[in-house]
């Protein structure tokens, strides 16, 4: 048994080469009654997925999280500025904070725009589902079929979030190659067209400096007196990619708008 495509029609079950859509917890329980050979742990996990999706907070978390992350960038920067002796990580982080905070602040203001209210409302009305962790670790190719696994983070949300997560991680690993990003968006739209609101939302999500925030937050909540060489290397890589990332964002504007 595999959980496959998530859509507004529910979570598609692929079992014995037969597709079934489930949108409610009781449907998952009914499936369990006809699948004695199915491991109990898998049934409980899938039941939890549907339960969590139906009872999710309907998208408010997206706006709240972005605002909170922006405040955390500022908090970490203020702490680093207050230190008399700064290590290499702190010097690099502070040298880039103005650029990244400006991006974070702009994205935070954009996400709270009224232009997205209707899109969030539609998500709530349709119980639109997202995978929540759509990346190459969770994608399995079976012949001409593509199966998605690991739905632990599935929830009600705007489906563009899955495209954003997949696109951002792919771009990070490929140096923000503009042609690759352009082709990925074009391929997505061959199957599902993006609305005007989704285009603006995708740009806003890509604008937010997610990787920089993660490093600042990890630093602030960790042992500040000890610099992790891995964190330092990640921060250097983030800074080194920023010019290409900015150029990619400019290109995306032309593609999306």
List the model feature ranges, each with a label.
Residues 117, 204-205:
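Short acidic/histidine-centered micro-motifs embedded in hydrophobic/aromatic stretches
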